[in-house]
Amino acid sequence: MLTDKQKEKLNEFRDVFIEYPIISTVFNDFDRLRLGKGLAGEKPCMLLNGDTGTGKTALIKQYKERYLPQFINGVMNHPVLVSRIPSNPTLESTLAELLKDLGQLGSTERKLRINGTRLTTSLIKCLKTCGTELIIIDEFQELIEHNQGKKRREIANRLKYINDEAGVSIVLVGMPWAEKIADEPQWSSRLLVRRQLPYFKLSENPKHFVQLIIGLANRMPFTEKPNLSEQATVFALFSLSKGCFRTLKYFLDDAVLYALMDNAKTLTTKHLV
């Protein structure tokens, strides 16, 4: 059994976020889009995709925490709005989800009885009032998977309209097939920034994977930091995870748990078996 202190240390490690090169690049993209809010001209949008386990949700959460809502002159300022495409989305449910995540008062059920035009007007007004500088919409593949033709174009057109009228850049985040949104004429030229979160590949950038392992090792809750950067260990961890960040992190979370239960001073190879 773990002591309360050990549980606290384990939870801290489970919540660790490592910013490796592609993450830094995406954060810089977000910053440029957000800071463009006060400039003239069209507001460019961005498409960010990656397979399951590449860290999309953790990345979004980390960026949002850098710009949390706060009261300014009696108004709740909401610089970064993070939302998602609901399952089997309609125009109304998509807009209602954005309003809900912006902190708009009233139940989603009540809003769904309001037509899309009124929802759009309300959302644009709230975005301006709240000083929103960037909208990040996760799970965008839901729009691709469940909507074809007219309904998908309707939602895509409305998001484009919000981008124009509110003057806020929008980041669309999803699985690789979310790229199909670029087939829509109204979005093909609007997505000026496109990034992909890939799995790690030792054949291309081995140092990035090694740096990630070192970063995780340095944040492990032990008096002696483990050495996980030896070639044999790196290859073993890569073979186990297949370059997937989530798989690697889950494995190391368990290894840290076993080491804490063992009251070990550091993580050793026996905890990695």
List each language-model region with its residue ranges.
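The catalytic "switch" region of P-loop NTPases
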Residues: 144, 156-228, 232
